[in-house]
Design a protein with these regions (language model features):
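Active-site regions of metal-assisted phosphoester/phosphodiester hydrolases
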Residues: 1-35, 43, 59-60, 64-231
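Short, flexible/disordered intra-domain loops and linkers
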Residues: 45-51
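A short, gly/pro- and small-residue-rich
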Residues: 55-57
């Protein structure tokens, strides 16, 4: 069984307006996933330092970041990052450039975990519905160009308020939705903005949102997770 999760950490800023990366790491340790896609993991302005300092990740968790190395002291690309549990092999990684007017993007990592090679995509999509559909098509086209038969897990903040429409329709036919439940707003979750999709070779065993007291305070989103097996 492989557990994956996605979490928009809002640059470490909690619902109490306190910026506490230690609290984000506590929540990640509570979720205890093998692979985590993060959104808003870097500050947006200035040098765009990571909202989760690298030395803090090393000292207080069992994770290491996929080294996208877009900027010194940044964790990812436009705030998109992937953490993997130590012992998981990172085979390849890259940035996916998306059509966007605002700073949005996606990242991809090919990994080997528990004897299985997988492709992991983390993404944070646009506020515009038209642009979101373009971005999902772009992500799917780019990963299909990279060995379409590799089992794939796509995770992130899709910013899609529709329950079934909008950009979600772009996944139909190629991917299954892990029904994780509403993740936004963390104080009173009503919208499924954060999603996990898997390709056909992956079986979804269970899925949900992580709703601990600390998670409700650490960000305005709750983490979503799924436990998976491979056929």
């Amino acid at each position: 069984v492989l557990k994956v999760a996605s979490y928009n950490i809002r640059k470490g800023l909690g619902t109490d307006r306190l910026r506490r990366p230690d609290r984000i790491l506590d929540v990640l340790n509570e979720v205890d996933a093998d692979i985590i896609a993060l959104q808003e993991a870097d500050r947006r302005f200035g040098k765009r330092h990571s909202a989760l300092p690298l030395d803090m990740i090393t000292a207080h968790s069992d994770y290491e970041p996929v080294p996208f190395e877009t900027r010194p002291d940044s964790l990812g690309h436009h705030g998109n990052a992937i953490l993997v549990r130590r012992g998981i092999t990172i085979l390849a990684h890259d940035i996916l450039h998306l059509p966007a007017l605002e700073p949005r993007g996606a990242v991809v990592a090919d990994i080997r975990a528990k004897g299985q090679e997988l492709r992991i995509v983390g993404m944070h999509l646009d506020l515009s519905g038209f642009r979101r559909r373009q971005q999902v098509r772009s992500v799917l086209a780019q990963i299909n160009d990279r060995a379409p038969d590799m089992p794939s897990i796509l995770m992130g903040d899709l910013n899609e308020w529709s329950r079934k429409g909008g950009c979600l329709g772009e996944f139909i036919g190629g991917h299954h939705d892990a029904h994780t439940g509403p993740s936004f707003h963390s104080q009173r979750p009503m919208a499924r903005l954060d999603r996990i999709f898997v390709s056909h070779k992956i079986k979804i065993l269970s899925a949900g949102t992580h709703q601990s007291l600390k998670a409700r305070r650490a960000s305005d989103h709750l983490p979503v997770w799924a436990e998976l097996s491979f056929s």
